[in-house]
Each structure stands twice: as structure tokens, then as C-alpha cells.
Amino acid sequence: MDTEAGQIELELFEADAPNTVANFVKLAKDGFYDGLAFHRVIPGFMAQGGCPNSRDGAKGMPGTGGPGYNIDCEINGQKHQAGTLAMAHAGRNTGGSQFYICYEAQPHLDGVHTVFGLTGNMDVVKKLSNGSRINKVSIQDS
């Protein structure tokens, strides 16, 4: 993930959350995330992005948009720790495109949100602020 703050590497947990990972990969390959902002950044908690209403010129309020459909939660044994990549939602099975990266462990979110990856480059993640842009999300097969 190329951001204004720098590159953030993502390891996706396809075995733990296959549908969530497939959705994220599809959106990334379609360019959905390109130009979006991290619209909710709370130091010590998390940085949230992926809302199309954070795009320049969008009419909706940032944090309220999605891809036009919902995906089911895939709760798994992965824990919310520093660097966790998880799907945001407004209630069970209402996720779509918004995701967040944890700055540190958030055990109260375990079993509530789908953890579908882990980030590297936490030094870059910690540089994110409200409004930091995602330039492009590129997918590389391992």
C-alpha cells in the first residue's frame, strides 16, 4: 500500500478470511482504494481508511460509504495486535471496503471484527494522520 506517509506492506490471511481477502484484493485491483484517505486516525488505537466518501469531491460524509454491497464477517482466531489489518463495519455482516490497522493490541475487538492481515512498516503506519491519502494498493502474489 503506497500512502502519502510511505509504503505499508500487507500480509493477507487468505486461509483465515478467504472472502474478506478476495474482496480486498478485488477492490485493490479495481483501483477502488486509490486516492482515498485515512478518515479516522486515533493514536494508540487505529487508523481507518477505505471509505469512498473520503475521495476528493465525494458528496457523502467520510466513514459512511462502501462499495455498494456488504460482506459477511469471518471471525477467526487471529487477534487484534499492533499491525493487525481488519475489516471495519457498522454491525455484524455490514463490512465492505473500510478497514483499519491497529497501533497496538485491542483485545476488545477480538471476535467482533474480521482480522484479515498484518502490516509491516509500523513506523510508516504511525506517521498516518486524518486525511493521509492512499496513493495505490498493489497486490503481489507470493
Predicted feature descriptions by range:
Residues 1-142:
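Cyclophilin-like peptidyl-prolyl cis-trans isomerases
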